[in-house]
From Swiss-Prot:
GO terms for biological process: cardiac muscle cell action potential involved in contraction; positive regulation of voltage-gated sodium channel activity; regulation of heart rate by cardiac conduction; sodium ion transport. It comes from Oryctolagus cuniculus (Rabbit). This is Sodium channel regulatory subunit beta-1. Belongs to the sodium channel auxiliary subunit SCN1B (TC 8.A.17) family. It is a single-pass type I membrane protein. Regulatory subunit of multiple voltage-gated sodium (Nav) channels directly mediating the depolarization of excitable membranes. Navs, also called VGSCs (voltage-gated sodium channels) or VDSCs (voltage-dependent sodium channels), operate by switching between closed and open conformations depending on the voltage difference across the membrane. In the open conformation they allow Na(+) ions to selectively pass through the pore, along their electrochemical gradient. It comes from the Eukaryota. A voltage-gated sodium (Nav) channel consists of an ion-conducting pore-forming alpha subunit functional on its own that is regulated by one or more beta subunits. Interacts with SCN1A; regulatory subunit of SCN1A/Nav1.1. Interacts with SCN3A; regulatory subunit of SCN3A/Nav1.3. Interacts with SCN4A; regulatory subunit of SCN4A/Nav1.4. Interacts with SCN5A; regulatory subunit of SCN5A/Nav1.5. Interacts with SCN8A; regulatory subunit of SCN8A/Nav1.6. Interacts with SCN9A; regulatory subunit of SCN9A/Nav1.7. Interacts with SCN10A; regulatory subunit of SCN10A/Nav1.8. Interacts with NFASC.
Length: 218
């Protein structure tokens, strides 16, 4: 739950606006046979600066030493390298409709154990200013483990516990408020009844006095 919440919030912040770009770390545990998103977000320091960006992804399988290129994405074109481990499994899930890429994430479908290892998301950006251009590059590193089934991390467990604690606290608070309001209404009703009774007795007493005065006068 904690992971899902973090992912949903991060995705909303990133997709809402370029100026609201937020760099969020990728998840690092994929489930065998499932689809997994490897997150790579690289924000510009100044959102108003014009830029063109492309990316190259490299991969080092667990137990090997060298990184190999698996894809390049530039000008809205995805170029996949010939690699049977990723053939028909890689889907672009980053920015679209712009050359100014800030979300450079990918999906890996039908994950296998061969996808365990280290990934590098190389981000190359050309910044255009009024009188000059400037090239920048950054590398985002992600270590991925493939497991048989999803494991609940401590953050997820703590988040769920906190959710139930919050529900209990809110329930107790609501009951206390209802009891307080009930007592307050009951006290007000009782006070009003006593006041009405006092007024009735006062009127009755006054009427008797008036009647007695009339009889004496006669």
């Amino acid at each position: 739950m904690g992971r899902l919440l973090a992912f949903v919030v991060g995705a909303a912040l990133v997709s809402s606006a370029w100026g609201g770009c937020v760099e969020v770390d990728s998840e690092t545990e994929a489930v065998y046979g499932m689809t997994f998103k490897i997150l790579c977000i690289s924000c510009k320091r100044r959102s108003e600066t014009t830029a063109e960006t492309f990316t190259e992804w490299t991969f080092r399988q667990k137990g090997t030493e060298e990184f190999v290129k698996i894809l390049r994405y530039e000008n809205e074109v995805l170029q996949l390298e010939e690699d049977e481990r990723f053939e028909g499994r890689v889907v672009w899930n980053g920015s679209r409709g712009t050359k100014d890429l800030q979300d450079l994430s990918i999906f890996i479908t039908n994950v296998t154990y061969n996808h365990s290892g280290d990934y590098q998301c190389h981000v190359y950006r050309l910044l255009s200013f009024e009188n000059y251009e400037h090239n920048t590059s950054v590398v985002k590193k992600i270590h991925l483990e493939v497991v048989d089934k999803a494991n609940r991390d401590m953050a997820s467990i703590v988040s769920e516990i906190m959710m139930y604690v919050l529900i209990v606290v809110l329930t107790i608070w609501l009951v206390a408020e209802m009891v307080y309001c009930y007592k307050k209404i009951a006290a007000a009703t009782e006070a009003a009844a006593q006041e009405n009774a006092s007024e009735y007795l006062a009127i009755t007493s006054e009427s008797k006095e008036n009647c007695t005065g009339v009889q004496v006068a006669e």
